[in-house]
Amino acid sequence: MTTTTFFLFLIPVLAIILLAVNLIFSPHNPYQEKDSAFECGFHSFLGQNRTQFSISFFIFALLFLLFDLEILLVYPYVVSAYTNGIYGLVIMLVFFLVGTLGFAFELGKNALKIESRQVYNFNYKSWSGYSLIYNK
């Protein structure tokens, strides 16, 4: 059996096995909020779709963009790591260090904490018999 044939048979089988394991072992807690439409991180009440919007969502989007660009800038080094040598490795480590320090600073300032204006009170019995109660 060649490597390509083995690869073409192994990957779908592995994907099906992992999906089956996820389906079997994942928690199932159905409640009404899971079936409702998701609108910008909060629920609209009585048609109030134009309420104030938390800036935290934009901070998350900017962080995603920054770390996505970080991966994009690291990719050329990974492709040519052998020719770059130790100098390129040091530059990449400094690049990662600056990104990590910035992320740690944001975590320290609680910039990634999203404050919700809603109070959840679910007292719902799921099909498995577990009670879901969450008061904020």
Curated annotation (Swiss-Prot):
The keyword Transport applies. InterPro entries: NADH_UbQ/plastoQ_OxRdtase_su3, NDAH_ubi_oxred_su3_sf. It catalyses: a ubiquinone + NADH + 5 H(+)(in) = a ubiquinol + NAD(+) + 4 H(+)(out). Its EC number is 7.1.1.2. Gene3D superfamilies: NADH:ubiquinone/plastoquinone oxidoreductase, chain 3 (1.20.58.1610). The chain crosses the membrane at residues 5-25, 55-75, 85-105. Core subunit of the mitochondrial membrane respiratory chain NADH dehydrogenase (Complex I) that is believed to belong to the minimal assembly required for catalysis. Complex I functions in the transfer of electrons from NADH to the respiratory chain. The immediate electron acceptor for the enzyme is believed to be ubiquinone. This is NADH-ubiquinone oxidoreductase chain 3. It comes from Emericella nidulans (Aspergillus nidulans).
